[in-house]
């Protein structure tokens, strides 16, 4: 496995050099949420990950989905316009769509399972049409089961980023995916944000970046 981490505006200043020295090789940075929020620290975080003391991270952005508010296509466009796109430079991950509950919002954002699957597909298809890559999907088994009916509609297109924190193993893989591409196993990474592991070697990480 290869160490990585994900960060947001809650970690405005990150010791990327320290994280690299400790073995981290990739970072996923929050870019947007819904169609009205952008991470004010995104540019500095993204640039910091790219130029960390001469060592670079393979890096990408993520979008926190608000499925009940605007269309999947609109949120994909917003994400791409604010740093979430992809390029074939070998160090850019496909964008990640963060699918989970939030605060006082309904657990499934007020959508039926069928409507949620359609929303995710609309986001995914628009992202693919613009960038040439399908986004990674971040979720946990409970949310995916409750909110998509444990849909297997994305198995052949979208890499799975599995959230299963404070566990000794990835555990249940939802949605028919045979394995997780990335496992988020804690929200307390030493250099900020959440702890992640790529499923495989550095070559697997590079392949994820290059497509």
From Swiss-Prot:
GO BP term, example: cell wall macromolecule catabolic process
Source species, domain of life: Eukaryota
SUPFAM superfamilies associated with the record: (Trans)glycosidases (SSF51445)
Catalytic activity, reaction form: Hydrolysis of (1->4)-beta-linkages between N-acetylmuramic acid and N-acetyl-D-glucosamine residues in a peptidoglycan and between N-acetyl-D-glucosamine residues in chitodextrins
Function (record text): This enzyme has both lysozyme (acetylmuramidase) and diacetylmuramidase activities.
The EC number(s) this enzyme carries: 3.2.1.17
Molecular function terms, GO-annotated: lysozyme activity
Gene3D superfamilies: Glycosidases
Location(s), subcellular: Secreted, Extracellular space
Keyword Secreted: yes
CC terms in the record's Gene Ontology section: extracellular region
Protein name: N,O-diacetylmuramidase
Keywords: Antimicrobial, Bacteriolytic enzyme, Disulfide bond, Glycosidase, Hydrolase, Secreted
Catalytic site positions: 6, 100
Similarity remark: Belongs to the glycosyl hydrolase 25 family.
